[in-house]
């Protein structure tokens, strides 16, 4: 018994030591890990949100290109609204075990690129959350939390408020045709003894967490109704319908593919060069708002039969000259919406264009090109020069309502919804 207790304490200390150094809730630490997906069972395009009352499960899956069995485990950690650790004992927010082995896996069958496909659902009979809030899931090898391979975020909501929201044109004539304003009301009848500034609103556009907008004070309080309708707080550049790439077949070229190259190591897919759309007219096109779907037009088992290819993206800048003072990124779930070297486009002096190669699994992808000012510490991402901004664009806005009750030690997620602008 004493030995078991020491082992348990060691595991808990290891998890806490890792969490103390964890900042990014979506990070891949092992380059052989690909196609990480975390979503509600049955809806691969939805935000990974669990209802505290219903315990609807998430499916978590990933591929390991090392193509040999690995002994993977997972654990979860409660975070605050700013994605810093809540620093609570796991016993305060979790029922069951916080170190669980991933037992469901399969081996790729007809794909040239060999891989192991792992998946599991959460919550499950071994582990379930007892508190609402932000969470990260950590997957690691050999029951050692120091051998982390990736982290990914998810949410647990305890619905205590109702949200009424809409997307409006800003009143400011300078941005009314290029931006969209999120306007919302939060009904708080179920809450008691709270101050309006204890409520925090966060809004993200098209599943990008790295440029979320936050509001801590409502514009109006009408009884139990909090209204947020400022002309400056929740305004987003509209962008355009995102670019798309159909990789469901490596034999038949879709409209966006320039050519295929068959090599001994697999397939290379060269995407047709992309150019700025800043001055092109807006047209309606139903996209998946930066998400991707794993599918295959020639097989029935996408998890295990879909192949991988090296996909080469090319962006041709104006005048074919390098951008001065700005960094160009490939944005979308295909790069995990990261703003780092995994998504950064590099200028090729020979082709006089920016290029980025990604190893992608067969499926359907949507993406955009974004700019970031190198001199600005934390700027809003700029789509205007590469994509253009049009009020008519359909975008997905996910709204999170957080509450820190008096005496509480972490931020509770008490409301969530997703609303679409100009849905066609």
Where are the predicted features?
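Low-complexity, Pro/Ser/Thr- and charge-rich linker/hinge segments at domain boundaries
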Residues: 156-179, 390-415
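Long, internal scaffold/assembly segments composed of regular secondary structure
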Residues: 200-283
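Aromatic-rich carbohydrate-binding modules that target alpha-glucans
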Residues: 95-118, 209-218, 312-362, 374-405, ...
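Short acidic/polar inter-strand loop motif in beta-rich domains
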Residues: 81-83, 127, 141-149, 208, ...
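Bacterial Sec-dependent N-terminal signal peptides
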Residues: 1-22
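Contiguous beta-strand segments within globular domains
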Residues: 29-78, 175-186, 298-314
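Basic K/R-rich, polyanion-interacting modules in nucleoproteins and related proteins
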Residues: 271-324, 413-424
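Ligand-binding face of N-terminal immunoglobulin V-set domains in extracellular IgSF glycoproteins
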Residues: 112-142
């Amino acid at each position: 018994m004493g030995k078991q207790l020491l082992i348990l304490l060691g595991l808990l200390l290891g998890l806490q030591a890792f969490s103390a150094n964890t900042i990014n809730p979506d990070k891949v630490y092992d380059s052989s890990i690909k196609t990480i997906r975390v979503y509600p069972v049955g809806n691969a395009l939805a935000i990974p949100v669990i209802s505290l009352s219903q315990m609807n499960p998430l499916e978590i899956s990933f591929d390991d290109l090392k193509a040999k069995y690995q002994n993977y485990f997972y654990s979860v950690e409660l975070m605050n609204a700013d994605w810093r650790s809540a620093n609570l004992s796991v016993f305060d927010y979790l029922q069951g075990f916080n170190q669980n082995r991933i037992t469901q896996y399969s081996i790729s069958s007809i794909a040239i690129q060999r891989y192991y496909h792992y998946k599991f659902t959460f919550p499950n009979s071994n582990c379930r959350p007892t508190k609402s809030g932000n969470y990260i899931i950590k997957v690691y090898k050999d029951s050692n939390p120091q051998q982390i391979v990736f982290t990914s975020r998810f949410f647990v909501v305890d619905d205590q408020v109702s949200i009424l929201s809409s997307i409006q044109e800003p009143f400011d004539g300078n941005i009314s045709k290029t931006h969209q304003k999120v306007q919302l009301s939060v009904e708080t009848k179920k809450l008691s003894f709270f101050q309006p500034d204890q409520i925090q609103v966060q809004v993200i556009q098209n599943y990008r967490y790295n440029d979320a907008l936050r509001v801590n004070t409502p514009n109006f309080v009408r009884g139990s109704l909090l209204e947020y309708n400022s002309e400056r707080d929740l305004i987003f550049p509209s962008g355009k319908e995102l670019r798309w790439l159909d990789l469901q077949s490596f034999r038949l070229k879709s409209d966006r593919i320039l050519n295929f190259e068959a090599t001994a190591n697999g397939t290379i897919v060269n995407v047709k060069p992309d150019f700025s759309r800043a001055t092109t007219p807006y047209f309606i096109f139903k996209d998946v708002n930066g998400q991707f779907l794993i599918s295959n037009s020639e097989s029935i088992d996408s998890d295990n039969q879909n192949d991988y290819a090296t996909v080469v993206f090319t962006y041709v800048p104006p005048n074919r000259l390098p951008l001065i003072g700005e960094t160009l990124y490939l944005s979308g779930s295909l790069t995990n919406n990261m703003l780092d070297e995994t998504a950064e486009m590099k200028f090729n002096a020979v082709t006089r264009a920016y290029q980025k190669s990604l190893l992608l699994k067969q499926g359907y992808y949507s993406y955009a090109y974004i700019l970031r000012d190198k001199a600005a510490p934390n700027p809003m991402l700029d789509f205007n020069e590469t994509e253009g901004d049009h009020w008519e664009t359909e975008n997905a806005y996910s709204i999170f309502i957080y509450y820190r009750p008096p005496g509480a030690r972490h931020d509770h997620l008490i409301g969530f919804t997703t609303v679409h602008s100009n849905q066609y």
